[in-house]
From Swiss-Prot:
Pfam families: YbeY (PF02130). Belongs to the endoribonuclease YbeY family. One of its GO terms (biological process) is rRNA processing. One of its GO terms (cellular component) is cytoplasm. It is an enzyme of class 3 (hydrolase). Zn(2+) binds at H120, H124, H130. The keyword Zinc applies. This is Endoribonuclease YbeY. The lineage of its organism: Bacteria, Pseudomonadati, Pseudomonadota, Alphaproteobacteria, Sphingomonadales. Keywords: Cytoplasm, Endonuclease, Hydrolase, Metal-binding, Nuclease, Ribosome biogenesis, rRNA processing, Zinc. Its EC number is 3.1.-.-. The gene is ybeY.
Amino acid sequence: MKLEIEIEHWPDGEWESITGGAAKATRDVEPALAHARLETSVLFTSDEQVHVLNREWRERDKPTNVLSFPMLDRDRLRALEPEGPPEMLGDIALAYETCAREAEEKGISLEAHATHLIVHGLLHLAGHDHVDSDAQAEEMEALEIAALAKLGIADPYGDRT
């Protein structure tokens, strides 16, 4: 998978490397993402920009930590032939202020939280969801936990009772 990364309104950091590591770990747990023809863009931006995107595309008038915009449905992704032109999997946008606040509240690094949200976003682009049923949510969370474990990042859901 080819990654296009744009960084706006985030502090200096190893965001390209973090994104690449998150993508590799996610490909390891979701083989459909291992396709060489896939392209994904990841935007590190502000709460203000994510608020605009959330309002325009999801009709939710507030910022959120991560948004994903899939461009291939799950069946088409799984049927993708090895040869052919690049295919845009979708876009991911992360909101700095929300991500930083959540990381502080959880007592984890911004890098670890951003990694989790990139994994989460990539799984959404691959057709996974957590809204329709508890079973779907559990499946998606298990993939997130497995991908993050490959990177040495603790289970982000481990504090639930």
